[in-house]
Amino acid sequence: MSIKKIINPEEFAKVWDELEIYFREENKTYGHRYLPISKQSVIDSWGHTALLNNTMHVWANLEDGKARGVIMFLEYMNTTFGEKMFTEYFWISNDSRKSFSLLKTALSFAKRKGIKYVTVSCVENYPTSERLKKVYQKMGFHKDTETFIKKL
């Protein structure tokens, strides 16, 4: 296993192609309410050199040259709080131990950049959501917001 920061748009698209195939069934069963994740929308929106180097920070867990996990964090100035934030955008992995290596890598990166605040989330429909919430709390995260969705 190796963790690699993804800064190249072609490599970013390859990671998403590999993960979409790898997690297709899981995404259908445990994904977000109403809305499946759109691989192409993510690639089109974030797969640009300037964004991957400055705003959307992406790390992939590579095994035998193929992506088996990815974590993405958005770095931005939160205008409500007047603070730079590091917000989890997407996180998926086939191995919880390797998955947390991705998270630790991202958090270390944010700390080195001097970012003071990090937000993380979890999908309610996922079987391990309650366990993940407890892990977040053990890591020092505090519950701040709940999000609700309704189809109109």
Positions of predicted regions on the chain:
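A short, internal acetyl-CoA/4′-phosphopantetheine-binding micro-motif in the GNAT/acyltransferase core
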Residues: 87-98
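Conserved GNAT-fold acetyl-CoA-binding loop/helix
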Residues: 24-46
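A short helix-loop-beta-strand connector motif used in the catalytic cores of GNAT acetyltransferases and
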Residues: 45-60
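A short beta-loop-alpha structural element at the N-terminal edge
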Residues: 1-21
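A conserved beta-turn-beta hairpin within the catalytic core of GNAT-like acetyltransferases
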Residues: 77-88, 144
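Conserved beta-strand in the GNAT
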Residues: 60, 66-75
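Conserved acetyl-CoA-binding loop-helix of GNAT-fold acetyltransferases
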Residues: 96-110
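Conserved beta-strand-loop-alpha-helix junction that forms the acyl-donor binding cleft
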Residues: 119-132, 152
